[in-house]
Each structure stands twice: as C-alpha cells, then as structure tokens.
C-alpha cells in the first residue's frame, strides 16, 4: 500500500492545481504529484524544472523515453514503468521498441547512439564510477557536449526521483502485474502500459 497519503484536488495548492491542469486528469495521472503536493512550493518548482527541461531539450523525445524506461527498470519504479508519455508514443516509442530494452545491446531496432546512451544509463544506475574516458569518448562520437550534459542530467533526474517514487509505492491504480511485491522483478515491456499527456502550465 502507499506509504504517504495522496492529497485530493480540494487539498491542492490552487496554483499547483492550475499549473497541472489537474481537473482534466485522472487520479492515476495525478498520483505522483498528489503526494508531492504535500509540499506545494517544492512541487511547483519540480513542475517548472521538468517543463523547462523538455522545452529546451536537444536530445530526441524517443531517446529520452527509452532512457527513462531503462532506468525505471533498474529502479523498479512501478509507476514509472507502467506509464508512457504521449509525445514519446507519437515520436515512435512503440511497445515493440520498449521490448528492445530487455537486451538493448542486441536490439536491431535501436541506433548505435541509442545503444551507447543506454549503456551509459545502465552504468549511471549500477556503477557510476565505472564510467570513464572510454565511454565518454564513445558518447562524443554520437553526441555533442551539450547533448552529453543533457543525457547525464536526464539520467540523474530519472534515477533520483524514480527511486523516491519507488519507495512511495504508488501502485494502487496500476495494472495488476505492477502491484507485485518488492521481491518480484517487474519489467516495463508488456502489453499493459498506459499513456499520459502530462501537460503543464508554467506561466
């Protein structure tokens, strides 16, 4: 069961509620924010930060979603794994492509750039001090310095906030397999993911 209570919309800070267009969303879409809403100023800062990150992104939406889902698997963040963003689906992140994340180094439908980015993400999750000159040199063959900074920052966001979300155990609205106990390893690849638009208003 969840470890922190989700606020109802009536309990939300009005500005946060408007920023998230919360009245137009389902309880499932609002679940992580309904916990963050206990601290409205931090929640609003998080919304603005992630919105700015997407607005100024130089990496493709497809790559960011692949990295997010691969990290969600390492984190075992059930709410992260069960969700797909609509803009990523529109950018070509199909469930067949998500299945490639099981063994990304072998997947024929991933590009060389995506494979090295996912290897970097894997190490960020599991052994960040093993990331050395050789991997950064390989990243440089596919990405600009600006893109590498964005990739690392995206990994940091997904790892940190994903692990936090995993400890909150917000699984009550998720498909059944994502509600399995912590001793069961769950994967993001499968037929039961759901799509969220997640629009925000930052002005």
Regions found by a protein language model. Name each.
Residues 1-203:
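Hydrophobic alpha-helical segments
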